[in-house]
Design a protein with these regions (language model features):
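N-terminal glycine-rich phosphate-binding loop and ensuing alpha1 helix
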Residues: 2-80, 98, 140, 144
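Well-ordered alpha-helical segments embedded in enzymatic catalytic cores
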Residues: 37-40, 111-115, 238
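Residues at the starts of beta-strands that form the adenosine-phosphate
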Residues: 6, 51-53, 97, 124, ...
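Structural beta-sheet core signal
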Residues: 9, 55, 127, 161-162, ...
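Conserved beta-strand scaffold positions in the cores of enzyme catalytic domains, especially
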Residues: 29, 98-100, 159, 248-250, ...
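Cofactor-binding loop segments of dinucleotide-utilizing enzymes, especially the Rossmann-like FAD-
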Residues: 12, 58, 130, 164, ...
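Catalytic-core segments of class I nucleotidyltransferases/pyrophosphorylases
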Residues: 126, 134, 138-146, 150-154, ...
């Protein structure tokens, strides 16, 4: 069975929910404390054993490429001033093996994944969506979310969808799966999927939340997938077809997931990540407590 070595991160969207800041700044570069959102995603991929990353880019996304590139002038300035700690931070993002391709038309997530076909070269691969940041608590023995999916792939093969249960009022915001429970309550063999169903039409409350291991068979299916909900090529529609010909698993991963594509979710992530920081947590908590009096 092929090892999962490559990952794709779709990052071509306009980020309209965060206008006006996203008019000139990629949504993926908005910082959670002092680190761009997309860096958290890339770091999860690397911590999960991924060796090569393809970012599906788009118009006005050059800042992403610059962030993961070397910065000779800045590095020289930091080196001359003896700021070795900051120099190390700047250089660590430049050493990551990142590739880029443009999605020329915004035709949905399925079309964005299809842009990665030649890069994947017939191999199974990972997908990480930039709107989903997952905090894995190492003190509780939690592995990165993508690593958990790779472990399921290594054990069962096929494709693996990263899922969690969502509250009823959120069902219509996600792709929802149905299936037969396997090996305990955290793993299902998928029999059906519906993209953003009404609650009355949802087969469960188990939602796909931005992490995937996908068989290369998906590319042929995407090439023949007609635009679906919203007039876009839906990855969910192709995965539903994939489940008819190959095993597709839904795994409820451990970790706290933040919807950073939503303003409130982004604020929650910023606050909680700041509170976990050894250098910021104490003073910031004191500030919040004083603020809430």
């Amino acid at each position: 069975m092929a090892r999962i070595k490559k990952a794709v991160i779709p990052a071509a969207g306009f980020g309209t929910r965060f206008l006006p800041v996203t008019k000139a700044t990629p949504k993926e570069m908005l910082p959670i404390v002092d680190k761009p959102t997309i860096q958290y995603i890339v770091e999860e991929a690397l911590a999960s054993g991924i060796e090569e990353i393809l970012i599906i880019s788009g118009h006005a996304k050059r800042a992403i490429e610059d962030h993961f590139d070397s910065a000779p002038v800045l590095e020289r300035e930091l080196e001359e001033k003896g700021k070795d700690d900051l120099l190390a931070i700047v250089r660590e993002t430049a050493d990551i093996n990142v590739h880029y391709i443009r999605q020329k038309k915004m035709r949905g997530l399925g079309d964005a994944i299809l842009c990665a076909k030649s890069f994947m070269a017939g191999e199974p691969f990972a997908v990480l969506l930039g709107d989903d940041v997952v905090y894995a608590d190492a003190t509780k023995g939690q592995q990165p979310a993508l690593r958990q999916l790779i472990d399921i792939y290594d054990a069962y093969g096929g494709s693996v969808l990263g899922c969690q249960q969502v509250v009823p009022e959120k069902v219509s915001s996600y792709g929802i799966v149905a299936g037969k429970e396997i090996a305990g309550s955290k793993l299902l063999k998928v029999s059906d999927m519906i993209e953003k169903p009404e609650l009355s039409e949802a087969p469960s409350n188990i939602a796909v939340l931005g992490r995937y291991i996908i068989s290369p068979t998906i590319f042929e299916l995407l090439e023949h997938t007609a635009p679906g909900k919203g007039g876009e090529v839906q990855l969910t529609d192709a995965l539903k077809q994939l489940a008819l010909v190959e095993p597709v698993w839904a795994y409820c991963f451990e970790g706290k997931r933040y919807d950073v594509g939503d303003k409130l979710g982004f604020l929650k992530a910023t606050v909680e990540f700041a509170l976990r920081r050894p250098d910021l947590g104490g003073p910031f908590r004191s500030f919040l407590e004083e603020l809430m009096k």
